[in-house]
């Protein structure tokens, strides 16, 4: 999982070696990235396409059309340019995930209001609710709303719903 995210967000051999910790050299980490790109060429094509779009337009776009601009995408300074490229790769993915959770929050509100339940917080891709003990009547409808808030074509969005007396003890 770490390798999937790391490659998708443009990690270098140096960066991956640091993430993997002791026992992995920069060369070994770079070889892992190379093997990953050879095994999953569509991922490399996708990320390369995002960078090309950012270079051509100066921005990337989420699935809902929000733009993020990258003024340093053509910077003469290599470090600044590569940072902008990594941001450009990240923006459509993270931005679309943010769009998805915000849409879910909006769409789940009528369900919550119908029962007097409260949404306590949103953390990355999680929503946390306070509900009466023993009342799980809206758990499945909320899960379904979250799975369908923003469809990704043929790619299923899977949502786990957990209930517990506190955040630590969710099951």
Put a short name on every predicted segment.
Residues 1-171:
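Conserved catalytic core of nucleotide polymerization and phosphodiester-bond processing enzymes
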